[in-house]
Amino acid sequence: MRIKIFMAIAAAFMCCDLAFSQAKLVEKVEKKGDELIIPYSKYILPNGLTVVVHEDHSDPIVYVDMTYHVGSAREEIGKSGFAHFFEHMMFEGSDHVKKGEHFKVVTDAGGTLNGSTNTDRTNYFETVPSNQLEKMIWLEADRMGYLLDAVTQEKFENQRSTVKNERGQNYDNRPYGLVSEFTSKNLYPYGHPYSWLTIGYVEDLNRVNANDLKNFFLRWYGPNNATLTIAGDVKTADVVKLAEKYFNSILINSNITLTK
């Protein structure tokens, strides 16, 4: 059933793609001789998504990374921890991927996945056999373009509890766990976005509601504030076609005016 849904959505994305122009090559780095450099090609899609491809055919695997150029430094006083909290919500399912299905699709394909957040970026990544690349790109496109309607209060409360437990385990209840928090608080002036930890303060996590997180997504998430990086046993032309196929139908986020 899941494969049928995947194929149906793939067909819909492909039809939408026909109305859009192609990705533009903006940078190409090639290795010369014994030069210590990683060759890659960089493209920009019409909606602003950056796509970086590195070919490495040494093993039949591929690494897929979607980086959004937003982290805890874009939070406000009283709203700390939003970027990291939303990282958790991105694994809770989207319009076409039920809760738990994202993990299942990746692991059933023989892959691994995770995400991370720091002050200036949030990224989501998978490593899978290279013949599973299209599924991974589809998953990333679906949660970029079709996530918010799938955010429920139940999922929100579940992840609020998870994030609070994570803070307790890694900071509050660990010997010297608060050293980094006190260091940041004293290193930067009050109100500076680097003065609080990415995990956020417990009082802010208690205060946040689902609409706050949705507004954070609407403000900072979108193709024109993201970079898709693909590295492994792939052909650059094939990757670009897949990126166009699944991402071209996702509109530019007009709230984003950053220059990357």
What are the residue ranges of the model-derived segments?
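Intrinsic structural disorder/low-complexity segments
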Residues: 7, 87, 143-146
